[in-house]
Amino acid sequence: MAVPFRRTSKMKKRLRRTHFKLNVPGMTECPSCGEMKLSHRVCKACGSYNGKDINVKSN
């Protein structure tokens, strides 16, 4: 198996890992009920999206 020719320095390793972070999801306030919801998704509290009530079918 191949092995690295040179040891990776702490700085190079840390610079590479700066992009391995978690992103905060985009939360907005629902205009209908005021609850916090994910952007571009139906509100879990009241079931509205884009000013319209979305009826979700349940099995």
Swiss-Prot record:
GO biological process, one term: translation
GO MF assignments: structural constituent of ribosome
One GO cellular component term: large ribosomal subunit
Annotated keywords: Ribonucleoprotein, Ribosomal protein
Keyword field contains DNA repair: no
Signal peptide boundaries: none
One Pfam family in the UniProt entry: Ribosomal_L32p
Domain of life: Bacteria
Family label: Belongs to the bacterial ribosomal protein bL32 family.
HAMAP family the UniProt entry points to: Ribosomal_bL32 (MF_00340)
Quaternary structure and partners: Part of the 50S ribosomal subunit.
NCBIfam families recorded: rpmF_bact
Name of the protein in question: Large ribosomal subunit protein bL32
Gene source species: Bacillus subtilis (strain 168)
